[in-house]
């Protein structure tokens, strides 16, 4: 019996390697690894590997389509936000399957400010949040809160990119100016919101044609490289424990069904 060919992007990285090791437990799959780094892809436990351009490159689409046309995988699994966004955009050109929500849902979920507005409009409870359009907005934003700590973060990006706790407007200005001057981000790429104390949960689910297949949740107990991060936090846990919380599940199901108009399909995190 011929094996099912599956592409894993970001192969060689921690998240992708977890997926690879899990799929490798079953012998019916032939894994193809993609990554932008020849060094990282070299350590991926895959059957074949390709160095590809970054998703932001104008050559990305052509190269990906070329490899897919040649290797003929049944499925491609991206493991980072830039490739999720780009592959979703070009899905009609790809001669393979993408187990994705519709593109409108993908684009909305990759923009935290747009998703916040969607949530408010649809009665989904979220932290009070304001968009920073200029540095002059920051002080008036702080005046709206009566909190010791606020949360300043980038609108797009994973792994808590550009995110930290701030206690006053000067700290927020410094933080945003740093990312603007040193990392090339725009002032308008940031939001400031209330910082929610308490436990920190992640919830992942798989849906097919509007039907929930699997949902699992975990409480983040500690964070990868937390000591070296200004916020002492990350969306990537070093240690987490599985939890079963029907209130959490109900909240996530409600949000996903509103996001997908009852037609959820793919993986939601």
Where are these regions (language model features)?
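Short glycine-enriched loops at secondary-structure junctions
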Residues: 35-38, 81-83, 104, 209-212, ...
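Residues that mark the start of a beta-strand
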Residues: 3-7, 149, 191
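A short glycine-rich, hydrophobically flanked beta-strand micro-motif that places a catalytic Asp/Glu
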Residues: 262-269
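ATP-binding N-terminal substructure of ATP-dependent carboxylate-amine bond-forming enzymes
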Residues: 1-102
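ATP-dependent carboxylate/phosphate-activation module, predominantly the ATP-grasp catalytic core
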Residues: 170, 174, 194-200, 204-260
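Active-site nucleotide/adenylate-binding loops and adjacent lid/helix of ATP-dependent enzymes
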Residues: 106-190, 197, 209-211
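Short, charged, surface-exposed secondary-structure boundary motifs
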Residues: 42-44, 60-62, 107-113, 160-162, ...
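Flexible loop residues that form catalytic
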Residues: 54, 81, 134, 155, ...
